[in-house]
Amino acid sequence: RSYCRVSRSKVMFYTVPIRNSARALKIDFIEDVIFNKPKITRFSGVPVYSIENIYWQKVAALAGTGSRQDEIGREVTKGRMEARDAFDIFVLSKKIRPLHIFLKKLPGDLQRGIVHWYRIFSRQDMKLSLLDLDIYDRGFNAREMIVYLENEVKEFIKQIL
Protein backbone atom coordinates (compact mmCIF):
# COMPACT_ATOMS: atom_id res chain seq x y z
CA ARG A 1 0.00 0.00 0.00
CA SER A 2 1.25 3.50 -0.77
CA TYR A 3 -0.20 6.96 -0.30
CA CYS A 4 0.17 10.30 -2.03
CA ARG A 5 -1.61 13.62 -2.07
CA VAL A 6 -2.67 15.19 -5.37
CA SER A 7 -3.75 18.78 -4.85
CA ARG A 8 -6.17 18.38 -1.90
CA SER A 9 -7.15 14.83 -2.88
CA LYS A 10 -5.73 11.74 -1.25
CA VAL A 11 -4.88 8.77 -3.41
CA MET A 12 -4.25 5.30 -1.98
CA PHE A 13 -2.57 2.62 -4.07
CA TYR A 14 -2.79 -1.05 -3.19
CA THR A 15 -0.97 -3.92 -4.84
CA VAL A 16 -2.51 -7.32 -4.16
CA PRO A 17 -0.69 -10.50 -5.16
CA ILE A 18 -2.89 -12.91 -7.12
CA ARG A 19 -2.40 -16.62 -6.58
CA ASN A 20 -1.13 -18.46 -9.68
CA SER A 21 -0.47 -15.20 -11.52
CA ALA A 22 2.77 -13.44 -12.33
CA ARG A 23 1.01 -10.07 -12.19
CA ALA A 24 -0.42 -8.39 -9.12
CA LEU A 25 -3.77 -6.64 -9.00
CA LYS A 26 -3.35 -2.88 -8.66
CA ILE A 27 -6.16 -0.91 -7.04
CA ASP A 28 -6.33 2.83 -6.43
CA PHE A 29 -8.81 4.84 -4.42
CA ILE A 30 -9.11 8.56 -5.07
CA GLU A 31 -10.78 10.73 -2.48
CA ASP A 32 -13.19 13.30 -3.88
CA VAL A 33 -12.54 16.74 -2.44
CA ILE A 34 -15.83 18.56 -2.46
CA PHE A 35 -16.00 19.59 1.20
CA ASN A 36 -13.50 21.54 3.24
CA LYS A 37 -14.71 19.81 6.39
CA PRO A 38 -16.87 16.78 5.59
CA LYS A 39 -19.09 15.37 8.31
CA ILE A 40 -17.63 11.98 9.19
CA THR A 41 -19.58 9.34 11.07
CA ARG A 42 -18.61 5.81 12.00
CA PHE A 43 -20.41 2.74 10.70
CA SER A 44 -19.25 -0.48 12.37
CA GLY A 45 -16.05 1.33 13.29
CA VAL A 46 -15.36 2.49 9.72
CA PRO A 47 -15.27 6.27 9.11
CA VAL A 48 -17.72 7.30 6.38
CA TYR A 49 -19.18 10.55 5.10
CA SER A 50 -22.53 11.58 6.54
CA ILE A 51 -25.57 10.74 4.43
CA GLU A 52 -25.94 14.43 3.54
CA ASN A 53 -22.34 14.57 2.25
CA ILE A 54 -22.94 11.39 0.23
CA TYR A 55 -26.12 12.93 -1.23
CA TRP A 56 -24.16 16.08 -2.12
CA GLN A 57 -21.43 14.00 -3.81
CA LYS A 58 -23.98 12.04 -5.86
CA VAL A 59 -25.60 15.27 -7.05
CA ALA A 60 -22.15 16.66 -7.93
CA ALA A 61 -21.32 13.48 -9.87
CA LEU A 62 -24.50 13.71 -11.93
CA ALA A 63 -24.50 17.51 -12.31
CA GLY A 64 -20.77 17.96 -12.82
CA THR A 65 -18.45 20.27 -10.94
CA GLY A 66 -16.62 22.11 -13.69
CA SER A 67 -18.27 24.39 -16.21
CA ARG A 68 -17.59 24.48 -19.93
CA GLN A 69 -19.14 26.21 -22.92
CA ASP A 70 -21.75 24.30 -24.87
CA GLU A 71 -22.34 24.47 -28.62
CA ILE A 72 -24.07 27.86 -28.42
CA GLY A 73 -21.69 29.48 -25.94
CA ARG A 74 -23.59 28.93 -22.68
CA GLU A 75 -21.64 27.97 -19.56
CA VAL A 76 -22.88 24.52 -18.52
CA THR A 77 -21.67 21.74 -16.28
CA LYS A 78 -21.68 18.14 -17.37
CA GLY A 79 -21.51 15.23 -14.99
CA ARG A 80 -20.68 11.63 -15.61
CA MET A 81 -24.25 10.59 -16.53
CA GLU A 82 -24.03 7.20 -14.82
CA ALA A 83 -27.18 5.22 -14.10
CA ARG A 84 -25.78 4.25 -10.68
CA ASP A 85 -25.59 7.91 -9.63
CA ALA A 86 -29.16 8.56 -10.80
CA PHE A 87 -30.37 5.45 -8.96
CA ASP A 88 -28.56 6.52 -5.77
CA ILE A 89 -30.11 10.00 -5.99
CA PHE A 90 -33.52 8.39 -6.52
CA VAL A 91 -33.12 6.30 -3.34
CA LEU A 92 -31.72 9.23 -1.33
CA SER A 93 -34.56 11.44 -2.54
CA LYS A 94 -37.19 8.92 -1.47
CA LYS A 95 -35.62 7.85 1.83
CA ILE A 96 -33.67 10.88 3.11
CA ARG A 97 -34.97 14.14 1.61
CA PRO A 98 -36.82 14.88 -1.64
CA LEU A 99 -34.42 16.07 -4.32
CA HIS A 100 -36.31 19.31 -4.98
CA ILE A 101 -35.84 20.28 -1.32
CA PHE A 102 -32.22 19.10 -1.09
CA LEU A 103 -31.25 21.08 -4.22
CA LYS A 104 -32.27 24.35 -2.55
CA LYS A 105 -29.35 23.96 -0.10
CA LEU A 106 -26.76 23.44 -2.83
CA PRO A 107 -24.72 26.05 -4.72
CA GLY A 108 -26.19 27.48 -7.91
CA ASP A 109 -23.76 25.66 -10.20
CA LEU A 110 -24.93 22.27 -8.89
CA GLN A 111 -28.56 23.37 -9.20
CA ARG A 112 -27.99 24.44 -12.80
CA GLY A 113 -26.06 21.23 -13.46
CA ILE A 114 -28.97 19.05 -12.34
CA VAL A 115 -31.43 21.07 -14.42
CA HIS A 116 -29.08 20.73 -17.40
CA TRP A 117 -28.77 16.96 -16.76
CA TYR A 118 -32.57 16.67 -16.64
CA ARG A 119 -32.87 18.43 -19.99
CA ILE A 120 -30.25 16.39 -21.85
CA PHE A 121 -29.98 12.90 -20.37
CA SER A 122 -31.09 10.05 -22.62
CA ARG A 123 -34.03 8.26 -21.05
CA GLN A 124 -33.39 5.23 -23.26
CA ASP A 125 -29.69 5.01 -22.33
CA MET A 126 -30.63 5.38 -18.66
CA LYS A 127 -33.10 2.47 -18.85
CA LEU A 128 -30.58 0.27 -20.63
CA SER A 129 -27.81 1.13 -18.16
CA LEU A 130 -30.08 0.35 -15.22
CA LEU A 131 -30.46 -3.19 -16.58
CA ASP A 132 -26.73 -3.70 -15.99
CA LEU A 133 -26.96 -2.81 -12.30
CA ASP A 134 -27.58 -5.39 -9.62
CA ILE A 135 -30.51 -3.56 -8.04
CA TYR A 136 -31.62 -5.20 -4.80
CA ASP A 137 -35.28 -4.19 -5.12
CA ARG A 138 -36.99 -6.82 -7.30
CA GLY A 139 -39.98 -4.51 -7.80
CA PHE A 140 -37.80 -1.70 -9.15
CA ASN A 141 -39.18 0.00 -12.25
CA ALA A 142 -36.75 2.13 -14.30
CA ARG A 143 -39.55 4.13 -15.90
CA GLU A 144 -40.98 5.05 -12.49
CA MET A 145 -37.51 6.15 -11.31
CA ILE A 146 -37.02 8.37 -14.35
CA VAL A 147 -40.48 9.92 -14.02
CA TYR A 148 -39.90 10.47 -10.29
CA LEU A 149 -36.56 12.26 -10.88
CA GLU A 150 -38.06 14.33 -13.71
CA ASN A 151 -40.91 15.40 -11.41
CA GLU A 152 -38.46 16.30 -8.63
CA VAL A 153 -36.45 18.54 -10.97
CA LYS A 154 -39.64 20.09 -12.39
CA GLU A 155 -40.82 20.83 -8.84
CA PHE A 156 -37.46 22.44 -8.03
CA ILE A 157 -37.67 24.62 -11.15
CA LYS A 158 -41.26 25.60 -10.33
CA GLN A 159 -40.34 26.60 -6.78
CA ILE A 160 -37.32 28.72 -7.69
CA LEU A 161 -38.94 30.62 -10.56
Kindly label every feature range from the protein language model:
Residues R1-L161:
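Compositionally biased terminal segments of proteins
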